[in-house]
């Protein structure tokens, strides 16, 4: 075989093998490592007490909900506290159990655990309004300045993701699981992509799913070998115990990041990385346990340390 034909044959073989192997292409990644670039809060300061939700804006400012002092805080890109708002109470912009936080280009969306609604603040932490919600909120993601998606809590109906406008009107919904599955078995974390599709991670089931905007399941995967959470009886309810997954997030490269729960190899530290078709590409381990993952647009990952006293920011390094 002469030189040019040999080179052509090798090129065709490489293309063929590449097409046949999952994970190769623009979403290919064999290893992910983290480099710490910022730490906010420590055992010997009062920057944070017990943070629950985090978000970041395009300018690098970081916003954090702190459950222990009932507040929403804004930090500059270097980690210095810029402003703080909120106090214990049930009035506008006040919290009893601050829990979830997300950001749109111009606004912040926060929840109080036992309030059926969403508090809206501008980026200067000025309270703007409360968006009513037909149910308590288990998870929240901003879809724009005037649109949010929530996982609605219900003991009777099916598990639902509701898309609300800025006045609380339901624009669409996805019923992703029948209530016959059991109490709390519909608990999820979710993240939307730019085309309106939703990626779901079930807290008490070994199940990761992708749904279309019109409510069709596109795929479903397990990552823990089909492990099942143990259940326990409390009064008349049978409740799940240990978590399978804790959170799910998207980067800007076509990767889905899933934080494992208590049933993962490294509990609350193992992160599974999938492509958008649900194929597992790699895993990595967080330095400390975390209750959530947050990825900003600059390809940074935020996670917890010191049982919620510390917020860590890491640069994601792809190999």
What is each of the regions a protein language model found here?
Residues 1-9:
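Bacterial N-terminal signal peptides that target proteins for export
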Residues 9-18:
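Bacterial N-terminal signal peptides
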Residues 19-319:
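Eukaryotic scaffold repeat domains enriched in small/polar residues
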């Amino acid at each position: 075989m002469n030189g040019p034909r040999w080179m052509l044959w090798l090129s065709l073989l490489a293309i063929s093998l590449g097409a046949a192997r999952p994970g190769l292409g623009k979403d290919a990644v064999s290893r992910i490592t983290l480099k710490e670039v910022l730490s906010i809060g420590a055992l010997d300061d009062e920057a944070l007490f017990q943070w629950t939700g985090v978000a970041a804006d395009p300018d690098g400012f970081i916003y954090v909900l702190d459950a222990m002092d009932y507040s929403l805080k804004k930090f500059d890109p270097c980690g210095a506290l810029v402003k703080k708002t909120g106090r214990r109470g049930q009035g506008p912009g006040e919290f009893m159990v601050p829990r979830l936080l997300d950001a749109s280009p111009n606004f912040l969306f926060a929840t109080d655990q036992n309030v059926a609604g969403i508090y809206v603040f501008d980026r200067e932490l000025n309270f703007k309004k409360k968006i009513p919600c037909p149910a308590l909120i288990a998870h929240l993601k901003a879809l724009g300045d005037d649109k949010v998606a929530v996982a609605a809590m219900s003991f009777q109906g099916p598990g639902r993701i509701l898309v609300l406008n800025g006045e609380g009107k339901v624009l669409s919904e996805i019923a992703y699981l029948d209530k016959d599955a059991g109490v709390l078995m519909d608990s999820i974390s979710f993240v939307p992509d730019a085309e309106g599709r939703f990626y779901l991670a079930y807290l008490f089931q070994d199940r990761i799913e992708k749904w279309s905007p019109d409510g069709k399941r596109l795929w479903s995967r397990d990552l823990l070998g089909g492990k099942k959470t143990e259940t326990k009886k409390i009064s008349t309810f049978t409740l799940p115990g240990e978590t399978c997954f804790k959170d799910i997030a998207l980067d800007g490269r076509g990767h889905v990041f899933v934080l494992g729960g208590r049933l993962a190899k490294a509990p609350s530290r193992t992160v599974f990385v999938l492509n958008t078709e649900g194929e597992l590409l790699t895993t990595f381990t967080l330095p400390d346990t975390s209750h959530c993952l947050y990825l900003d647009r600059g390809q940074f990952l935020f996670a917890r340390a010191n049982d919620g006293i510390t917020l860590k920011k890491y640069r994601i390094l792809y190999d």
